[in-house]
Amino acid sequence: MKRAFHVVYTALALNFIIPVLIYIFDPQGAVAGFVQVGQLFSATPYPHSEDSMLWRVLGIANVATLGFSCVLLQVNLRRYFAALLPLLFLKSMASVGFLVAYVSEPHPSYMAACLFDAITVAAMWFFATRAHRAMA
């Protein structure tokens, strides 16, 4: 189970760290990817420009924290296991936020992000708790 944990958490860490670099160096590319997901499911154009330095900085901080937390857990799961709870909370809030966005403005990109984040939270919890239990 420890090997599976490390494989999954490596994928998760990269899933957060690579987008941070994209948010920093190609923010329009990040928005374009989000828009493309919506276009797969609908012809409805994404209704927002997403051109704000404030939200870009907050997004970078949020996603960098997710990546850093995944790396911490990989470095020493037993020592940093308490970091799992805020990691799960942060990603769960993103999932709930996308669900609320979808309910108020039903664009398919929101639902796709909600479901992807929910699956990510489940994987984070499952693999970390199983590996931690196996260490005991």
Where are these regions (language model features)?
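Membrane-helix interface motif
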Residues: F25-V35
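Membrane-helix boundary connector in multi-pass membrane proteins
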Residues: R78, S95-A113, T129
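Core segments of alpha-helical transmembrane spans in multipass integral membrane proteins
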Residues: I18, V37-Q74, L88-F89
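Membrane-water interface at the C-terminal end of transmembrane alpha helices
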Residues: A118-A136
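Juxtamembrane helix-break-helix junctions at the cytosolic face
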Residues: G67-A82, Y102
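Hydrophobic alpha-helical membrane segments
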Residues: A82-F98
